[in-house]
Amino acid sequence: MSTNTTHTSCPKESREDRAFQKTYAEGTLWPVKVGMQTLNLSGTYSCNGVPFSSLPLYDTSGPHSDPSLQVNPAEGLAPVRDSWNFIKSISVPCAAPVNTESMTERHPRMAEDGIALTQMHFARKGVITPEMEYVAIRENQQLEEWIRANGRGGTPSEPITAEFVMSEVAAGRAIIPANINHPELEPMIIGRNFRVKINANIGNSALSSSIAEEVEKAVWACRWGADTVMDLSTGANIHKTREWILRNSPVPIGTVPIYQALEKVNGVAENLTWELYRDTLLEQAEQGVDYFTIHAGILEKHLPLADKRRTGIVSRGGSIMAKWCRANKQENFLYTHFEEICAILKCYDIAVSLGDALRPGSISDANDEAQFGELKVLGELTTLAWKHEVQVMIEGPGHVPLNMIEENMQKQLEYCHEAPFYTLGPLVTDIAAGYDHVNSAIGGTLIASYGCSMLCYVTPKEHLGLPDRNDVREGVVVHKIAAHAADLAKGSPIARLRDELMSSARFAFNWEDQFNLSLDPPKTREVHAASMKAAGHEGEKADFCTMCGPDFCSMKKSKEASAASAIEPGR
């Protein structure tokens, strides 16, 4: 697939270094423009005989990092998908919107006569949508020639094509969460044959945070590399908070609809009804939510198994449905009405993230009968959703020790027919409070190397409190490290290239390129500057750092030894 590229400069608020430039790659099938950050290196480095003086980087920040665009949060982002003229051609305006409270004058749309408007539907028909072409360009990062020459594990391979994207979506091995009512979205793909993605959770609680703070956290998460964001608000103004987040988000937004439904019954789980939940789905569908976490797999028969656990049910949605089932002495209405749920989702192209209500909340509960019993039900629901051509991913644990992680991936592939796996960690120990983001990244790296498609981030506040923007940044960056490490383990030539360039810059003592090739350039620059200042070398472009100093730097001595060897007589 050939692409054309246009360039703009990158604003200071997006990257603190002007080496970064916002660039766009244009499609050939549809009028799509795929945004990237191109890093202009201060030096030229040779990797496998190919010179690199710049590197295109996958970018999730959207218009927020384009200096030619002025973003007003009160107005939201431009509806870029509308310009592709695809959504309007396949949908009709909603006749009677459930909720008319909106930031924009755009009228919500839906399928006509209940037909499927999903990416899976079009993929099965052999239609390449704008979203499919977009993600193919995005995954390649304009490095097609590098991929051909340096494919997985050093074996030459072909770049990702729109046709390959289509085949993976058709088979259910990948999803493109893209509600037709989220026109501000820049499409992305979740599947084990693509880059490992990460999700950032935000959302207010009954005790803290405002709409402005949550919008800021959503944009902040995108700026640092979150591929999707989940709004898990449980406090006041849930609808308005979600509206502002959606209108300002270039990444897919997920929710857990049962939270808002619970708010409508004043927090009394026993009073929930299918009709109330259905109306909540419609409300969020019309707003543009791209995927719903739905805890339809926890059944009455699982509850006695959960009672035997050390930490019971730790999923909020799972505990709500368990309480409802016991109080009403009925089966989970999300399970009994699942086909009706699918009938709604397919009209808006909303993906379903089948929630793991029985994920283990402690090491002692990992891989137990309750967890895997629910996983089998999620596999049944996957088949049912695919019958309606609804895109599906499966949520996973949780707290799992390292030696038990691989079994989770194996059973998910077996029970859930290779649908994408999306895990919370797993956290590999129970004693890492205050450092659970690191705990989660350890397990996340391993399970992603086995084939998990997306990692849900954990912040330093996990188990302790509501994260602020600094926690969001740290959680995102740490899980970007995990995702990148897994991509390396899986043989990604694009992931490998960035590491090769970093190593070259490090050996050349090119500090600016080292900062910019890292996942957090401002922090690396700040740490280095502070340490050099403390050692009395402020502002120097030194061929050493304060870890070893000028006399004990191994790389410096290695270069000196090589230089001396090269000029020895007789050589």
From Swiss-Prot:
Binds 1 [4Fe-4S] cluster per subunit. The cluster is coordinated with 3 cysteines and an exchangeable S-adenosyl-L-methionine. It comes from the Bacteria. Its EC number is 4.1.99.17. Substrate binds at residues 201, 230, 259, 295, 315-317, 356-359, 395, 422. It is an enzyme of class 4 (lyase). Pathway: Cofactor biosynthesis; thiamine diphosphate biosynthesis. [4Fe-4S] cluster binds at residues 545, 548, 553. NCBIfam families: PRK09284.1 (NF006763), PRK13352.1 (NF009895), thiC (TIGR00190). Belongs to the ThiC family. PANTHER family: PHOSPHOMETHYLPYRIMIDINE SYNTHASE, CHLOROPLASTIC (PTHR30557:SF1), THIAMINE BIOSYNTHESIS PROTEIN THIC (PTHR30557). This is Phosphomethylpyrimidine synthase.
